[in-house]
Amino acid sequence: MRTTLAVCVAAVGMFLSAGPAVAHHAFTAEFDAKKPIKMTGTVTKFEWTNPHAWFYLDVKDDSGTVTNWGFEMNSPNMLLRNGWTRNSLKVGDVITVEAFGARDGSHIGNAKSVTTSTGQQLLAAPNQGQ
């Protein structure tokens, strides 16, 4: 009887913990595939961390106002498979990013690809929202 109870408690615990794990990785919860954005800016920070790498860009609009944007990417392991390294971006690099914008209109996006000033294109999230 104790074994059955322990198995039931463990199973319920697994089911209850699965929801938050899936929600954390839900692209559509935070980003909108119908809001593609493309912008060029200067890298201010590059975080090569799990579970998702991030980079930040200073982007100047037509009036000269600079806004800092953050872009989420896949995990470093997935990025390595697409040709990235922890040194692919450096503070001061000028890059162009294609991404999907945030649902709430904040200055973040889910990066799809990055093009460096030399013309090299790196895929950041080939399976997201496409």
Please provide the spans of the model-predicted regions.
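Positively charged n-region of N-terminal signal peptides that target proteins for export
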Residues: M1-V7
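Bacterial N-terminal signal peptides
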Residues: V7-A18
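Sec/Tat signal peptide C-region and signal peptidase I cleavage site
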Residues: G19-A23
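Conserved hydrophobic positions within beta-strands
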Residues: G41-V43
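Short aromatic-glycine-enriched beta-strand elements
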Residues: T49-K60
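Short, structured beta-strand/loop micro-motifs enriched in basic residues and often containing a Trp
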Residues: M73-R81
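Short nucleic-acid-contacting surface segments enriched for D/E, G, S/T with interspersed K/R
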Residues: R81-T96
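OB-fold/S1-family single-stranded nucleic acid-binding modules
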Residues: A102-P126
